[in-house]
């Protein structure tokens, strides 16, 4: 191949170990569109704007649900959880949405007061929409880790119930996010142009 790129530093390390060549690291395609471009396809949400915490975890643990519950109590906001296949009892105090599709997912993030997630895409869209957010165990996921360190928001990772004290509804630094994404979009687009 003439050109190989990956989405995070961890993958670049692995490719280099296997091939002896260092691939370039570029943005995940999710970040190539702006918030306004994503809003054009999101659906309306039938829930109070800005008056809920969105919880989106692909494989939620009991510990994460306990942390989410503690955050809900601290901030006095209900939790809306997007669920697809998990039927665990510890979800009971939350508002459940089983039928949310991709365009609903975007809207729920955009209209939340706070996003709690363990997923890359939950984190990515929180950044794109400049939403206050926290990531469960974000430093253990290569893609999440790469983007948080790139922007300088690694403090948005929460690992245990002891981290609940730092959770708040303060806005993330939208300018810092946009400056980073604008630069990386330009770099990624230039790479694609040259590679094709």
Indicate residue ranges for each PLM-predicted region.
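Active-site anion-handling motifs in enzyme catalytic cores
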Residues: 1-196
